A protein has these predicted regions:
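Helix-loop junctions and short alpha-helical segments
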Residues: 68-69, 75-173
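Charged alpha-helical initiation segments
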Residues: 1-67, 81, 91-101
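Polyanionic, low-complexity intrinsically disordered segments
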Residues: 2-13, 17-20, 27-38, 160-241
């Protein structure tokens, strides 16, 4: 069985390999012979073939690696949150068994449909009855990250708020916690996903070294999150004290 950690390590390695490829291409572009780069021998031959400039290819690759970084952020956060919910299910915990933060989040998740355009007072009453019934019946809580996470919108602030809503404190004093970098990665992902910017243009201003430095900080932040949530689960902090 492939575990979360196996998949996380694999995706981290994919990003590192992608960055190595870009550094290799950068090296070939800077190697000159008779005024021509080694890169052009492969991607812009005089005899025909693939006509692709170095800068266009690198910009496309930079956009792709930015998406890969966002994906590992979303994958990690989603799986860490679901690992908490798995513990709640495995231990057959009900509303009265979990901590106050999770209780509050569970109620908010059920009441979320009240804010939908077609919702009315009857919707509000029905959802309140659902909450009351579940509490009185001592039903096991069934929660899933797909219902509690802000889809496609994970940045430093939303990640911090997500974990705090479960009673987990993110290490905001850590050098790896960089909301400015995380929001840039999120915005770039959304712009590419919605087609408002091309892959050639999206990361034009960022160097390969910039992206590599940002990736290192993001990975450091994610690994701190993994450690924090692992301790939270081991200490059963999801339970009511």
């Amino acid at each position: 069985m492939i575990t979360f950690q196996d998949t996380y390590d694999s995706r981290k390695k994919e990003i590192e390999n992608f960055l190595e490829l870009m550094k290799f291409l950068e090296k070939k572009e800077n190697e000159r012979e008779d005024g021509k780069s080694k890169f052009s021998e492969f991607f812009y031959p005089e005899t025909g073939g693939i006509h692709l400039t170095y800068q266009s290819l690198i910009n496309i690759l930079k956009s792709n690696v930015s998406l890969m970084i966002y994906n590992i952020i979303e994958y990690t956060v989603t799986n860490l949150i679901d690992s908490i919910y798995d513990e709640i299910r495995v231990n057959h915990l009900s509303y009265i068994d979990v901590n106050d933060s999770i209780r509050n989040l569970w109620r908010k998740t059920i009441l979320r449909s009240v804010n939908e355009p077609n919702a009315n007072f009857s919707t509000f009453l029905r959802k309140n009855e659902e909450i009351i019934s579940a509490i009185l019946s001592n039903n096991e809580l069934n929660m899933y990250a797909k219902n509690t996470l802000p889809g496609g919108n994970l940045d430093g602030t939303s990640i911090k708020e997500t974990f705090e809503s479960h009673g987990i404190q993110v290490r905001t004093s850590s050098r790896n916690y960089r909301p400015d970098i995380l929001i840039g990665i999120k915005e770039n992902r959304n712009n590419l996903a919605h087609g408002s910017v091309s892959f050639v243009e999206a990361m034009r201003e960022d160097s390969i070294d910039d992206i590599r430095a940002n990736e290192s900080l993001v990975v450091g932040f994610l690994e701190e999150l993994i450690e924090t949530v692992s301790t939270y689960i081991e200490d059963q902090k999801y339970k009511k004290v």
